[in-house]
Regions:
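Bacterial N-terminal signal peptides
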Residues: 1-8
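N-terminal, motif-rich segments that launch catalysis or mediate targeting to/interaction with membranes
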Residues: 8-130, 141-145
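Active-site microenvironments of hydrolase-like enzyme catalytic domains
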Residues: 138
Length: 145
């Protein structure tokens, strides 16, 4: 019974990520939709790639959440927005222990921007699908407390 429940929970998580990435395409400006809409199936299927890596790659887990309550109270003015500054203030081990999703989103966005500059379309698609996953994770209340 526990295995069945586990499978249902995992499947719902995968399904939610796929729906979010799929629907996100329709909120894009027309100039971006021209590229993304023909590739909507790729973005949908690969929305779950980060979760597939989560228990295989040690560094992956902390990219999916952040224990915000560890950093004071809203609006978290003392929390550094820059990764290097955050590492100086809290140490990398502590940051990884409590999750790095906002900083990882920034890193992924920089990689995606670089892929656009290089016109590396396969990389653009992969990074877009994964960035959608991390942004969605950042908005899950249980991933942010």
């Amino acid at each position: 019974m526990m295995l069945l429940l586990y499978q249902q929970v995992c499947c719902w998580g995968f399904y939610a990520h796929q729906v979010i990435n799929h629907q996100a395409v329709f909120s894009l400006p027309p100039s971006m939709m021209a590229f993304y809409k023909p590739n909507i199936d790729f973005l949908t299927v690969h929305a779950v790639d980060p979760d597939k890596r989560r228990y295989i790659v040690d560094a992956e887990g902390p990219r999916h959440f952040m224990d915000l309550n560890r950093y004071g109270s809203y609006p978290f003015d003392a929390l550094p927005r820059n990764w290097d500054t955050a590492v100086e203030k809290y140490g990398e081990d502590s940051l990884r222990k409590h999750g790095i999703v906002p900083w990882w989103i920034h890193i992924m966005l920089a990689r995606l921007t670089n892929a656009f500059r290089q016109k590396d379309y396969p990389r653009i698609l992969r990074l877009s699908a994964e960035l959608g996953h991390y942004i969605a994770d950042a908005h899950v209340p249980l991933h942010a407390n």
